[in-house]
Amino acid sequence: MKKIVIATRGSKLALWQAEHIKERIMQQYPDSFEVELLVLKTKGDIILDVPLAKVGGKGLFVKEIEEALLDGRADIAVHSMKDVPMELPQGLTLGAIPEREVPTDSLLSARYDGLDALPQGAVVGTSSLRRQSQILAMRPDLEVKWLRGNVQTRIRKLMDGEYDAIIMATSGLKRLGETAPFHSELGPPLFMPAVGQGALGLEYRSDRQDLAEMLAFLDHRPSRICVEAERGFLFGLQGGCQVPIAGYAVMTGDNSFELTGLVAELDGTAVIRRTAAGTEADARDTGLTLAAQVKAAGADAILQRVYENGHASPQA
């Protein structure tokens, strides 16, 4: 029986995602493979006392995992697509993208039922400049406070009273079955998700054609098309996952989609949003074109201010 090693981070959510892919492989190929997990710590897991946007560098949550692929310790890596840099290391490729989980964000609170119920000056926790900029655009009277840690840690801090509300990805909450006394979704078109949010991606060495064929059953074409368009938009802006950039594509037909991209000032005082239509064949190019439109509307100046003020680094 052939052994397959899946590299993953050690958080509860990352382990859930890796176990999910492991189970799918074993269901598809019963008695064909022995599947093991290789649990690794990444830079993003180790540095917990600094906001992610200020840590800098590419691939905060993937670099160590990619090294395991390149040196042969692992065969497959399971990533949250929002954490995957636009440019992969030489010798690696992104293969199947399984069906995407809901891409929205969620507002959790112990006392307040939704964004409108938060009192003036309420403290909202998030680790994301994208979430910060959008929540302040909707409610400039709120105070945004830095929040790091895994899903359970963040919810514990909320319940301990450190925050009046926190914002987290809905997909992670659903996968782990976590919530809070009050839970409301923040989603498109009012609140835009990160590029690739809710989607998983499988990475492996480019010379492993056997893995490309073996994992093809996991690929969900609509999810792949949409994520490819979103990543084209992010690449066109030379942005990483720790910047105030949002992008979300939705299928409008079997081969067509609509992509919306957003860049916002950190204090929410300016929000640039544009939409474009595309097809599977030009998914990435549609994202690049939309990025150029957003740049022309002022996004370049906004992102430059973010970088100059040390809030984030390009291509994080």
Swiss-Prot record:
It holds the Pfam family Porphobil_deam. One of its GO terms (cellular component) is cytoplasm. It catalyses: 4 porphobilinogen + H2O = hydroxymethylbilane + 4 NH4(+). Pathway: Porphyrin-containing compound metabolism; protoporphyrin-IX biosynthesis; coproporphyrinogen-III from 5-aminolevulinate: step 2/4. GO terms for molecular function: hydroxymethylbilane synthase activity. CDD domains: PBP2_EcHMBS_like. The keyword Plastid does not apply. HAMAP family: Porphobil_deam (MF_00260). The porphobilinogen subunits are added to the dipyrromethane group. Belongs to the HMBS family. Its cofactor is dipyrromethane. The modification S-(dipyrrolylmethanemethyl)cysteine is found at residue 241. GO terms for biological process: protoporphyrinogen IX biosynthetic process. InterPro entries: HemC, Porphobilin_deaminase_cofac_BS, Porphobilin_deaminase_N, Porphobilinogen_deaminase_C, Porphobilinogen_deaminase_C_sf. It comes from the Bacteria. Its EC number is 2.5.1.61. Keywords: Porphyrin biosynthesis, Transferase. Binds 1 dipyrromethane group covalently. This is Porphobilinogen deaminase. It comes from Oleidesulfovibrio alaskensis (strain ATCC BAA-1058 / DSM 17464 / G20). The lineage of its organism: Bacteria, Pseudomonadati, Thermodesulfobacteriota, Desulfovibrionia, Desulfovibrionales. PROSITE patterns: PORPHOBILINOGEN_DEAM. Monomer. Tetrapolymerization of the monopyrrole PBG into the hydroxymethylbilane pre-uroporphyrinogen in several discrete steps.
